[in-house]
């Protein structure tokens, strides 16, 4: 990320913090529950989400970028009402999980213009000032589309989409967006992978040229995917 920024690529880092949130909720004795890969978030949990995402994970990432020689600034979707959201009407069981209604790109563009790497914690806000937990993959897609980004890269803990999750050699290197529904219906995409795949699909449908799903655990995976002929993950195209 730092190298890309140093060679002139405008990089925006959008992050969640699912494991960290689950760990903190567990320490506080609050159970974690998920529906279709989305965390059910009650009034108590949304405070923990804000605390962990904006107060801990975000600052850890900003600090790490600084250690690597980059210049980053931490932002939360509430800042400048950057990520405007409302409650998901047809899924009341999710509680304070929001769907995005608008992205205000001004804070992001201002940070980029000043030479910073914006690091964005995905908490949204409604007209009444209520905070909402926003799925990070969904937020990344909406932000990429609003910025008219050329590429969006989703970092995961698997190689990409697989024909057989138990076979490392069954990677699907390229997926056309019209194939996504069939992949989900066929069970090749399930659980927490559904929001990731849908976010890549939506980004491409909304004008992002390419979306990538790659294994973030592989050293330099972003550079390999973007600057090699074969890549190492799954690329989504129209």
Write out the residue ranges for each language-model feature:
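Nucleotide/pyrophosphate-binding catalytic subdomain
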Residues: 1-217, 224-226, 230, 237-238
């Amino acid at each position: 990320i730092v190298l890309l920024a140093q060679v002139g690529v405008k990089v925006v880092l959008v992050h969640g913090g699912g494991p960290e949130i689950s760990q903190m909720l567990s320490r506080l004795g609050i159970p974690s529950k998920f529906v279709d890969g989305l965390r059910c978030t009650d009034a108590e949990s949304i405070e923990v989400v804000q605390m962990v995402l904006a107060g801990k994970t975000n600052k850890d990432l900003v600090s790490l970028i600084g250690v690597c020689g980059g210049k980053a600034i931490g932002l939360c979707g509430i800042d400048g009402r950057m990520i405007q959201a409302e409650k998901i009407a047809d899924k009341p069981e999710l509680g304070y999980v929001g769907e995005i209604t608008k992205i205000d790109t001004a804070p992001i563009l201002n940070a980029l213009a000043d030479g910073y790497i914006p690091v964005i914690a995905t908490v949204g806000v409604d007209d009444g000032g209520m905070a909402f937990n926003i799925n990070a993959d969904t937020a990344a897609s909406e932000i990429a589309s609003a910025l008219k980004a050329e590429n969006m890269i989703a970092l995961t803990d698997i190689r990409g989409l697989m024909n057989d999750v138990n076979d490392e050699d069954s990677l699907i290197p390229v997926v056309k967006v019209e194939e996504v529904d069939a992949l989900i219906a066929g069970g090749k995409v399930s659980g927490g992978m559904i929001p990731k795949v849908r976010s890549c699909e939506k980004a491409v449908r909304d004008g992002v040229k390419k979306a990538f799903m790659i294994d973030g655990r592989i050293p330099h995976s972003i550079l390999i995917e973007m600057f090699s002929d074969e890549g190492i993950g799954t690329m989504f195209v129209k």
